[in-house]
C-alpha cells in the first residue's frame, strides 16, 4: 500500500490511465486472485487437520483459528479490491474522469484491508505470547484450557479494529487513488508507523520463539522431569507447537520485510520513476498475500510431518524384535 498524490479533480492523468489499463496490472490481479483461491482451499484443509490431529493445546488452537480467520478476511477484501480494479480497467479504459476512485469511496474497503493485515500480524505475536505462557507456567497453562487463547484473540481483534481508525484520524479523504488498495495521502505518515510496528512485532516474535525453543529443549532434557510422563508431554507439546509457530512467523516476516523494503526503496526513488511504472511496481511489491497463504500451507505441512514421523517410529518399533537398548532408543525418537 502506498500513497498517491492528490489531483485537483477526479480525472486521471495520461500516466494514471496507463497504470489503470496496463497489462502488468491485469496479470498481477490474476496472480493474486489465484493466490487468494489457494488460500481458501488450504484454509479448509488446515481446519480439517487441526480438528483431527491433537498436536496443539486448546489455547493455541483458538489462536490458530483466529489467524486463519484474518488470513481469509485479507484474502477476500484484497480479491474484491483487485478484481474491481480489473473490471474498471476494461470498462472505463476510455473514461479518465471515471476510472479513478476517491479515498472516501474506498474508506470501508481500505479499513477492512488494514484490519486484515493487522490481524494476521498481531495474532502472530499473540501466538508467541501463548507459547511463552506454556513455557513459563506449564502447569497453570495446562489447567487454563482455551482461556489464554480466547483472551489473546479478543485483544488481537480489538487492536486490529483500532488500527485503521488510528491511521485515518483526521484524514479529510479528499484525494484520489487508482483503487482502494492505496493509503489516503494524509494517512501516509501514520501508515508508515503502522508498517514499522508490524515489522517490529514480527522480529520480536521470531526472537522470542527461538528463545522458547531453546528453553523447552533444555527443560525436556532435565533429569528431574525425565521419568514424569505428564511433564515430558507438556514440554514436547510446547516444543513442537513453538517450532511450527516459528516457521509461520519466519514466513510472515519474510513477506512483510520484502514489502516494506521494496516500497521504501521505490518511495526514495519515486522522482526517477514514471508514475505508471511506479504504481505498477508498488502493486507487485505487495507480498502480504504470499505471507498469508503460507499460514495454512505451513500448518498442513508441519502437522503432517509430525504425524509421519510418529507413524514411522511406531512402525519401526512394531515391525522388529529389539534389544532393550534399541527399544529405549526408539522410544526416545518417538518423543522427539
UniProtKB/Swiss-Prot annotation:
Any Pfam family: 7TM_GPCR_Sra
One annotated GO biological process: detection of chemical stimulus involved in sensory perception
Cytoplasmic-side positions: 50-61, 129-148, 214-243, 302-336
Ranges that cross the membrane: 29-49, 62-82, 108-128, 149-169, 193-213, 244-264, 281-301
Entry coiled-coil feature ranges: none
Membrane-side (Extracellular) residue stretches: 1-28, 83-107, 170-192, 265-280
Keyword field contains Transferase: no
Assigned keywords, A-Z: Membrane, Transmembrane, Transmembrane helix
Tissue/organ expression: Expressed in the URX sensory neuron, the ALA interneuron and in additional interneurons, pharyngeal neurons and muscle.
GO CC entries: membrane
GO MF annotations, alphabetized: G protein-coupled receptor activity; olfactory receptor activity
Topology term for the membrane: Multi-pass membrane protein
Localization, UniProt: Membrane
Family named by the database record: Belongs to the nematode receptor-like protein sra family.
Entries under PANTHER family matching the protein: SERPENTINE RECEPTOR CLASS ALPHA-10
The name this protein goes by in its record: Serpentine receptor class alpha-10
Organism whose genome encodes this protein: Caenorhabditis elegans
